[in-house]
Amino acid sequence: NELLLNDISNSDSFVVTDSGSIIATFVLRAGEDPTYKEIREGDWLDDGPYATIHRIASDGSRKGIVHLVTQYALAQYDSIRIDTHRDNVVMRNALLREGYRYCGIIHCWNGSERLAYQLIAR
């Protein structure tokens, strides 16, 4: 997959391990994300610099992956943005539990709609 290879070559792809086994993966990228330039039915919490989390995937063997990924991101960046499908209720609830705020709707490069969230370290 070209997208995955690009993430790896840009050093944006990370894994979560447990006892030496990979249990999850995610992308963490600093800087402006083109798909986040326009947001509908809401606004971002601020216009400052941010990092974006993309493509969190877990093997399901452990709960709390969103928490681990968020803590890793917040150790490096003060503002984190993330998006998810409207139907992904599990992810939406996990984001709210972690303190992310719903900000509005964005559209991906392929035109698909996503719900956008932001978390600012306090």
Segments and roles (model prediction):
Residues 27-61:
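Conserved acyl-donor/pantetheine-binding loop and adjacent beta-alpha core of acyl/acetyltransferases
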Residues 52, 75-87:
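Conserved GNAT acetyl-CoA-binding A-motif
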Residues 17-19, 118-122:
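Active-site beta-strand termini and strand-to-loop segments that position acidic
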Residues 83, 101-115:
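Conserved catalytic-core motifs of GNAT/GCN5-like acyltransferases
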Residues 1-13:
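Active-site rim helix/loop that mediates acceptor-substrate recognition in acyltransferases
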